[in-house]
Design a protein with these regions (language model features):
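Mobile late-domain/C-terminal helix-loop "cap" segments
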Residues: 192
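Charged, amphipathic alpha-helical regulatory modules used
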Residues: 187-188
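Class I SAM-dependent methyltransferase SAM-binding "motif I" and its flanking Rossmann-like core
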Residues: 1-69
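A contiguous loop/helix-start segment that scaffolds small-molecule binding in enzyme catalytic cores
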Residues: 6, 68-183
Length: 203
């Protein structure tokens, strides 16, 4: 990011005198997730708690939005020697929208010397031992821990019978859920039709 910012502001263009190569790699959150199971199977987002370059109100807004949206969260830079209250405040924001029992994984130095993995829950997050080398994975409403593995279901159980594999009542294989976009719109239209005056304002 900073490399491109400096180059572009200095008048550099792709194909110019300075060659830039971006080599893809494994992100910290992916490495950490692989050590605890499959917590990122469904939608997720990453948020840094460092306010060295980002105002805290922006960080807080992102935390609240992610929690309301039921995203699995990966928190970077959760705590440092000087930033001791940021994780406490983040926990407070998240608990407005998540149960205290929500599974949490804390991974330190994934695949490096000093690696450590700790499973806990959101209600105990602020008391956990962690620092700048730690990444925090916070589950969504469906995430669970079983036999030491943190798993976020992809959602197949909502659509298919776990034993037979057949679509559940009202669902069709290869089609959107009954409450996918089209189904949801149809349900809203039906509700509006039943309301007096049939207007959205009545909703």
């Amino acid at each position: 990011g900073p490399t491109y910012e400096v180059l572009l502001r200095s008048g550099w263009h792709p194909g110019g005198d300075i060659e830039v190569e971006v080599i893809p790699g494994i992100t910290s959150l992916s490495a950490c997730a692989s050590l605890v199971g499959a917590p990122l199977t469904h939608d997720f987002c990453s948020i840094s708690l460092s306010d060295l370059l980002t105002p805290w109100p922006v960080i807080a807004q992102r935390l609240a939005a992610a929690a309301r949206g039921d995203f699995v969260l990966a928190l970077y830079s959760p705590r440092s020697g000087r930033r001791t209250q940021h994780l406490v405040e983040a926990q407070r924001i998240l608990l407005r929208h998540r149960q205290a029992e929500t599974p949490v994984a804390i991974v330190k130095s994934a695949y490096r010397e000093g690696q450590a993995v700790h499973l806990t829950h959101l209600g105990a997050l602020a008391e956990a031992q962690l620092g700048m080398l730690s990444t925090v994975l916070i589950g969504n409403a469906s995430t669970y821990v079983q036999d030491g593995l943190m798993v976020t279901p992809r959602g197949y159980a909502q659509k298919y019978d776990a034993i037979t594999g057949d679509p559940r009542s009202g669902e069709r294989a290869g089609r959107s859920l009954s409450l996918g976009l089209e189904g949801w719109q149809a349900a809203i239209r039906e509700q509006i039709g039943h309301l007096q005056g049939g207007s959205l304002a009545a909703l």
